[in-house]
Every structure is written in C-alpha cells, then in structure tokens.
From Swiss-Prot:
Partially overlaps SCS2. Residues 76-97 are annotated as: Disordered. It comes from the Eukaryota. It comes from Saccharomyces cerevisiae (strain ATCC 204508 / S288c). This is Putative uncharacterized protein YER119C-A. The lineage of its organism: Eukaryota, Fungi, Dikarya, Ascomycota, Saccharomycotina.
C-alpha cells in the first residue's frame, strides 16, 4: 500500500484525538484492517489527520500522529462524577512514547480519563 493511500484511509477511518503512545502491528506495518479495527475501538465515525505531525524520513519509514479522545458513555460519566465527589480515584496508567500498544490494550485504555496521543508508524 502506498503511504499516501494509507494516510487517506487513516484520515477517513479514525476521529482523532490517545499522548505519546506508539502503535504498530506485529510486522511493524499498518494495514487497512488495522486502521478500520482501530476506528472501531475508539468508536468515532470520522477523522482529522494531523498532517503537520507526519514525519517523512524515508519512503519506507514514516510516522503519523493522531489525537484520540477517549469515548465515554453517559453511564461512565456518572460513575466518574460520583467517585470524584467522595472516594479517591485511581489515576489511569499512562504509556511512554517508547512503549508499544496492542489493539487489546487500546481497547482497555480507550475509556481512561487521560487524553492520549497515538503514533502510527509504517515501515
């Protein structure tokens, strides 16, 4: 897949807004299926691609950064509000930029209170 095509798919698949997190699949490449699966996980219908954050190093190694806003249901918002009024809330784990985030981990952390930045790297 040509990188420009990938960016186009990325831009239409994920609504952007999850900070310094790195996502690659096992081969280090991003497939259309990965992007569509990621869009499903974050539950956003459209995307805004931050093209100013696309680093063009070589034709085979480019990086694109997306901002992913966590998805909250009204029920989750109510629970969070009650906890913050009374009991102490445990802060969600944040990932360093060098860590690799799997699809399953993204699914777990998509509802954290922290806004994250996810970098997609194609090689």
């Amino acid at each position: 897949m040509v990188w420009s095509e990938l960016l186009e798919i990325l831009a239409y698949s994920v609504d952007c807004s999850v900070n310094g997190d790195l996502y690659t699949n096992t081969s280090g490449e991003i497939s259309t299926a990965d992007i569509l699966r990621f869009a499903e996980i974050v539950e956003y219908p459209s995307a805004t691609l931050l093209t100013q954050n696309v680093r063009q190093t070589t034709p085979h190694n480019k990086q694109c950064t997306l901002l992913l806003k966590p998805f909250y249901s009204p029920c989750e918002n109510n629970k969070r509000k009650k906890k913050s009024e009374g009991e102490r809330v445990r802060s969600p784990r944040t990932f360093r930029g060098s860590e690799s985030l799997s699809i399953q981990q993204l699914e777990v952390y998509r509802t954290t209170m922290v806004e994250r930045r996810v970098s997609f790297t194609a090689q």
